[in-house]
Regions:
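Generic, well-ordered alpha-helical segments
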Residues: 15, 26, 42-49, 63
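A short helix-loop-beta-strand connector motif used in the catalytic cores of GNAT acetyltransferases and
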Residues: 41, 55-69
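Generic recognition of well-ordered alpha-helical segments
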Residues: 52, 56, 115-118
């Protein structure tokens, strides 16, 4: 299976069925925390939920539509990062991610996003990387700003997060801008 070493002790691995129990354990333990910025944790209550997610993700990967990876710190699954969409006609990918609360503040997301940006531009010949984050999700927005993304706009009423409608900040990074950093 596909793995990408971010740094010693941190790697990204294409999702596989063996990760389902670890995803379930994290989401069960941190459902309230994750539900602040993600709609799906409220429904992620079984191993079958994650097996289905992994099966869809692998199918979409095979079709060239997305790339979904488990974030592994040491041998422990700590989160998820992906090219949510790979748009060949626009030469653009959208990156999404989430991380267990106990692993926040260690730079794991910033380093992982940076690695996927490199991959998007060098291996996939993309011209743009985009990230969408809830306006109030300051840690996620700081990742974008730290890595040189530009705020391209705010989409109002963008997502219903478990009964709370939120606006999204859309960040973009061009291949040219990345090369200049």
């Amino acid at each position: 299976m596909f793995t990408l070493e971010v740094e010693k002790g941190l790697k990204l691995a294409l999702v596989e069925p063996k990760f389902a129990p670890q995803y379930l354990e994290i989401v069960t333990r941190e459902r309230e925390y994750l539900s602040q910025w993600l709609a799906w944790p409220q429904h992620a209550d079984s191993n079958d939920f994650f097996l289905s997610f992994i099966k869809r993700s692998l199918h979409d990967y095979a079709d060239g539509k997305s790339l979904v990876c488990a974030m592994l710190h040491g041998d422990k699954l700590v989160g998820n990062i992906s090219f949510n969409t790979i748009n060949q006609s626009l030469k653009k990918v959208q990156i999404g991610y989430w991380l267990s609360a106990e692993h926040q503040g260690k730079g794991l997301v910033s380093k992982s996003v940076s690695k996927l940006i490199d991959m998007a531009f060098t291996e996939h010949d993309m011209q743009k990387v985009e990230i969408s984050a809830a306006v109030e999700n300051h840690p996620s927005r700081k990742v974008c700003e730290r890595l040189g993304f530009s705020l391209e706009g705010i989409i109002t009423c963008s997502e219903n997060l478990n009964g709370r409608v939120v606006d999204h900040a859309i960040y973009g990074l061009s291949r040219t801008a990345w090369a200049e950093t």
